[in-house]
């Protein structure tokens, strides 16, 4: 809840207004995960809060740290055998965390491990925040950038994600700039238009992964509902109205979507749009039939796009020695039970 709502809830409990400032600061600035940490509150009040206003728990069920680059992969538990994953990455500019918005995913992308364990439910704003707060405390760092690109589809959890954005950008909380937040969608067109109405200064990322309908429908079932014929006009409108550059995510799947022809079609699809392409060297997943593209194929793909004046980058491959692809840790945990 935001500060106004917390104040109202505490007022109904008969508490003075200054308690709201204390508690809000503990939760959203000091990242307290339990009332017992709030040492400037009387013990009796802490016990009352536990009973009447319990905090959502977000516990570390598993943690992997890359020996190569320090990337940290978390499996968080939310009770009742419900798990979601986050990845903490260190860059020159600071720390970025990739958080989940759902437990599992409905979208069924054939190359994504998030779908393999099945969909359970959407995460609440407090549970999305909990991933950030728990990681900050665990590593004793401050996170400056957030990527909503973990397990789940953010636009399928629209209201909770919007509420999360309100809380994480609040100046009385973590106060993270909206420009330091990226939201990734597989292409839920009505959700893109709803997001457009909000006029937020975040970065919209589109999980594209194929430049024509036949291939995209094969690897991404969402394309059968919202094809490129609907998705691309929505993207062009979003970029035009917000003046924000769209990032098109493109997982390089060896022998599937990495041909010269695919590069040519991708360039034609994006021609004239305010955007850039982020090529993703995929991590291998044992349960997936897909293999990563070779470095030579990626370079050729880049060359074709650049010759067509398409802005393209290759995502730095982090955590290759751990299960850094979203869904892998959760799937392993489910199999163990």
Kindly label every feature range from the protein language model:
Residues 1-84, 236-244, 250-337:
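Auxiliary Fe-S-binding modules of radical SAM enzymes
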Residues 136-145, 150-308, 312:
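Conserved AdoMet/S-adenosylmethionine-binding subsite of the radical SAM
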Residues 66-67, 100-101, 114, 184, ...:
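Short linear Ser/Thr-Pro motifs
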Residues 115-145:
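Conserved alpha-helical substructure of the radical SAM core
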Residues 72, 84, 95-99, 107, ...:
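Generic beta-strand structural signal
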Residues 90-127:
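Canonical Radical SAM [4Fe-4S] cluster-binding loop centered on the CxxxCxxC motif
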Residues 80-89, 93-94:
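P-loop NTP-binding catalytic core
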